[in-house]
Amino acid sequence: MLPEKLENINNVNSQQSTKNIKLPFLVAGVITLLLIGIAGFYWFLGKSPVSIVVRNSQPGAAIFVSKSSPAMVSLLVNPDALQTIEQKGAFSQVTNSLLAKSNIDYQNDIKPWLSNEITLAVTTIDIDRDPENGLQTGYLMALATEQPEKSREFLELLFSKRAFAGTNLGIERYKGVKVIYDNFEYSQVENIQNSLAGAVVNNFVLLGNHPQVIKEAINNLQAPDLNLISSLAYQKATQQISKNAVAVTFLNLPEVGKWQGLELAESTYDSQILSLVLNSQGLLAESTFLTNSQVVPPSLPLSQPIGALHYLPESTALAIAGANLSNLVNSDLAKLWKQGTATIYGDSKNAISLLLKPLVEIQQSWGLNFSQDIFSWVVGEYALALLPNSENIIPNWIFVVEKTPQLVAGIAHLDNIASTRGFNVSSLNLDEQKVLAWTQITATSENNTSINVDAKIKGVHTTFDNYEIFTSDLKTLTAILSQKQKSLLKNPKFHNAITVIPQPNQGYIYLDWENSQDIFKRQLPLLKFVEVLGKPLFDNLQSLTVSSYSSEPGTLKGGIFFQLH
């Protein structure tokens, strides 16, 4: 049917003003639609016990993707499953906005045949594999179809609209499959950047930015040893896909580095798989990094609640808790940090100065080296907290460390550092509890007749139960010792968040977003930009919890739980 129309269409091309449909626009549109749709769904999910059935947690379109593909991302549910947010009008607004320029109507043209998967893949860094003429990345979008005939009608409709917009079309039968594509043989070269090719293969509609992308997808299907499923790294990664994952991303890290023009430094990990799982409270994003090297966790997995958390108040804005910091610098987490920061920023020091500026300032002002002066003697449980400070923009802090044989020497070392920085280390009684205070004492004179002495406490610490407790001020320590305030462990928000994290694990990083965003926006200006990009998510975010829970050799597995209203 389509070939008969092409000649008439091409004769009136010059009279048409309809804009062309560009694959980059379609890809960006689909990604945006999925992210906004899912984020909006999270909002609704927190108010209604809706469940989504995931039929298959492994992307079926992987059979079309090369084993050397840098990246593949898949939505594994039908977008209609997310349309519960239709009550807020968001889904219709987003689809109408994204597809407006394409003259494609989602309800009539796509919805009738779309099944339970949409996959986007970067298939190759350079389509013609000739770097001398520049690099042109190959992109493939695969949409699962329940009705191949209707999806073929959609494909013909899509290319008919492109023909009416002024594009010359070509049709080729490749290995038994009809491939429709933009034919730029007589067109300007720059238009190739906006080209589109498509085919219906088995139960998928394939769209690519070049006919060669579609042809290679067909090759990968017919020669299974070429496709991603035959990759040992991918096979190992898919074993880590979370149950009921609604979306999955696979990254070939060396190829991602080449694609982005980065040299993969400190290359411990060679692949990553990310899964997104919904529950009644929010979203769990689980990530697994894989390596053939031997890696070790920073500490033995913890299957019981961390006792040091009992001393953190319910109002804690940020909590970091775990065990054994002494091995952190040699752990799997440290190797991942080095690989990521060295690749992107050149080295870890540059990354720390840019991303963790507040920590750098603390080290410089106190003359500290965290690894040598603190981490080395923390071999038991620990908990670190930041608390909102109504009297100052600088938050209060708490550091709790379990008693171990190394603790006495570690405390003495910190007291010595405080003394060398000019602070007075003195003992005082606080409700019959012996406390050591780091105090900055200054004296000023008035008219040579009187002298005023001002003492500012920079930190205090004391032994309590089986822990040493450090705080930024006496008021915070007094509240802990009185045991009249509720513990963070009694905070329903915190309790619900850590319940989602698998056990055993390496501990938690817990951020109460509602209670801490003002603190971190002041300290990390980049966070404001991130918040704008993820506005649908951040608008409804209560807290986020990060944990690591690797259980198999050669893997580093962890998750981030976004708790939503």
Where are these regions (language model features)?
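Single conserved position on a long alpha-helix in the C-terminal lobe of the eukaryotic protein kinase
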Residues: 73, 112-235, 375-497
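C-terminal/domain-terminus segments
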Residues: 344, 399, 529-533
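Residue-level signal for secondary-structure boundary sites
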Residues: 81, 149-151, 214, 257, ...
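A short linear-motif detector with a strong N-terminal bias
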Residues: 43, 49-54, 97-102, 158-160, ...
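Structural boundary/hinge residues at secondary-structure and domain interfaces
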Residues: 19-29, 34-168, 176, 251, ...
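Leucine-rich, highly hydrophobic segment in Treponema pallidum outer-membrane-associated proteins
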Residues: 4, 11-42, 53-57, 190-192, ...
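Short, surface-exposed, polar/charged, turn-prone segments marking secondary-structure boundaries
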Residues: 99-104, 169-170, 226-228, 234-237, ...
